[in-house]
Amino acid sequence: MSAEKAKAYWQLMRMDRPIGSLLLLWPTVWALVIAAQGMPSWNVLIVFVLGVFLMRSAGCVINDFADRKVDGHVKRTKQRPLPSGKVTSKEAIGLFLVLGISSFLLVLTMNPLTIKLSFAGIFLAFIYPFMKRYTYLPQLFLGLAFSWAIPMAWAAQTGELPWIVWFVFVINALWTIAYDTQYAMVDRDDDLKIGIKSTAILFGRHDKLVIGVLQLVTLAMLVLLGQHYELGQSYYWTILVAASLFVYQQHLIRHRERDLCFKAFLNNNYVGIVIVIGLLIAFW
């Protein structure tokens, strides 16, 4: 394999832009820390960290395969490996299979419940890229796909799925819809021209309001989560930091400028990190 082809594969997997993997990783770590009520098992943690990066890469590959005919018409995506011809469709499918199989082999080291849950995760990861053609709610499907690691991680750590798992699942799904709507605001003008659907288009001039409501509900549910586990004051300070980050994001998107909407999206990485820190300190 030439260096140029290897670089194209690397870009196709978004390894040069790991923000998506990090946004998938942090909630997975939330689940592991809460399930363990402290530091999770090292082998489970390692499997899920590797699995997150492999599955996110697989998701990026199948997403670009699904969008290969439209990405060339979008300013932000026209230089991606598939629309630019650096990687063929056949090569992309082969890479997707390698990444997907590698992820599944990791899951096979976990307990039977985790293995069963993984099939739904694979299904969600596969269908999400195609949803933007059929519904204005593809961000909802991304929320489900990005949250599915939560029950999987919990099951791997404890072998059980208590109701609180699904509470955390909803927290992350709402947060994901909020930040991916910010992301969709970047491409809204291009998407309207080529017929791609998104919540940014659905919400229209109410986009900032809906994002704000989703962020407020996310924060409220995080507070309720802390009350359920009787977490200490340090946890609530981190929620306050997360709230301030959301306020900053609202400031960034106030004029719906592309670059600032993308900056707001990227800022969510810090939200995920802050909550991880809060949970680790609280359960330590």
Swiss-Prot record:
User: Which cell locations does it reside in?
Assistant: Cell inner membrane
Source organism's superkingdom? Bacteria
Q: What catalytic activity is recorded? A: all-trans-octaprenyl diphosphate + 4-hydroxybenzoate = 4-hydroxy-3-(all-trans-octaprenyl)benzoate + diphosphate
Q: What is its EC number?
A: 2.5.1.39
Pathway, per Swiss-Prot/TrEMBL? Cofactor biosynthesis; ubiquinone biosynthesis
The cofactors it requires, by name, are: Mg(2+)
Sorted alphabetically, the Gene Ontology BP terms of this entry are: ubiquinone biosynthetic process
Keywords associated with the record: Cell inner membrane, Cell membrane, Magnesium, Membrane, Transferase, Transmembrane, Transmembrane helix, Ubiquinone biosynthesis
* GO cellular component terms attached to this protein's record: plasma membrane
The terms under GO molecular function for this entry are: 4-hydroxybenzoate polyprenyltransferase activity
Transmembrane stretches in the record are 33-53, 93-113, 136-156, 159-179, 209-229, 231-248, 264-284
Function of the protein:
Catalyzes the prenylation of para-hydroxybenzoate (PHB) with an all-trans polyprenyl group. Mediates the second step in the final reaction sequence of ubiquinone-8 (UQ-8) biosynthesis, which is the condensation of the polyisoprenoid side chain with PHB, generating the first membrane-bound Q intermediate 3-octaprenyl-4-hydroxybenzoate.
Tell me the protein family, please: Belongs to the UbiA prenyltransferase family.
Q: What is this protein called?
A: 4-hydroxybenzoate octaprenyltransferase
User: What organism is listed for this UniProt entry?
Assistant: Vibrio campbellii (strain ATCC BAA-1116)
Tell me the organism's taxonomic lineage: Bacteria, Pseudomonadati, Pseudomonadota, Gammaproteobacteria, Vibrionales
Name of the gene: ubiA
